């Protein structure tokens, strides 16, 4: 039997070993790493809210309710802040009700495995987040994965598979490693045509996309056609946790059936209060300004990369991949950039398929245009030196 140490050594030999880096201070557009200031190009803190004064103040207010929630909400009771946050999320997403989970992973595994089971069918985009796939496996429903954004292939599966059980179509709204957006209009149409529920994981769209930051569904004009809006509180909203926003019936069903909700101590008061403040801020004039600043930063950065000849893999959002290919070249690219003061992660298997390794750049509203221009120039220099462009 291969030992754990041998497996780790094999990962090192393949260039797939992972380790953590310690940063000092708060998450921001610049952080201190290994004793020097570096530009953060790998955070999902898209609007810069993780260190926003209003969220900090709200978290301090939340501590007045204690630092922990005691137990599962079904055991020790729901705190007022839980209800206030869920009411605010439901209003934000335009649904009857919402239910808060402890993380995006907990939400997806809990929602998917609760809504379907043996004899049911799940139709999932091949590039969906790992938590969706894990939820599908936990559900024991039949899992049918269609090629990325291929609606003709999905329709063939819907025609041929599923039997008489429940059908669930599930997709990322924004795909986390590619930065492209799901064809939600077509997904809504197919869900209605074939009697399926449609669930959209909008972790990377919430707070960022659409005229008022409601996400990819708002951007594409199909908010009402989505049955389950899943999203996170820890990316564009800068806090922590996740949610399902849906009909009252579905949310009540999840309270009774979603094991990741039932068997977990709930989010603490400081996080709940900060999350409420985040949604209020996204809905404010400042939120609009931040989205506009983010959009301008994204356009600038992509323009500079395109001029340098990089392949950004069809990104439509603030997630900007730079295609490299081999894992070793990708990690060398990341290493040299860090030496040059740019913190950006190389993405390797199992996160992406072998041969499709990339740098995953993420842009923030709080980046300064001059910083992004300088970063793009350094990326171009290093990319040419390494033969990527």
UniProtKB/Swiss-Prot annotation:
It catalyses: 6-carboxyhexanoyl-[ACP] + L-alanine + H(+) = (8S)-8-amino-7-oxononanoate + holo-[ACP] + CO2. Pfam families: Aminotran_1_2. It comes from the Bacteria. It is an enzyme of class 2 (transferase). GO terms for biological process: biotin biosynthetic process. Keywords: Biotin biosynthesis, Pyridoxal phosphate, Transferase. Pyridoxal 5'-phosphate binds at residues 104-105, 176, 204, 232. Pathway: Cofactor biosynthesis; biotin biosynthesis. Its EC number is 2.3.1.47. Its cofactor is pyridoxal 5'-phosphate. The modification N6-(pyridoxal phosphate)lysine is found at residue 235. GO terms for molecular function: 8-amino-7-oxononanoate synthase activity; pyridoxal phosphate binding. Substrate binds at residues 18, 129, 351. Disulfide bonds: none annotated. Catalyzes the decarboxylative condensation of pimeloyl-[acyl-carrier protein] and L-alanine to produce 8-amino-7-oxononanoate (AON), [acyl-carrier protein], and carbon dioxide. Homodimer. Belongs to the class-II pyridoxal-phosphate-dependent aminotransferase family. BioF subfamily. This is 8-amino-7-oxononanoate synthase. It comes from Citrifermentans bemidjiense (strain ATCC BAA-1014 / DSM 16622 / JCM 12645 / Bem).
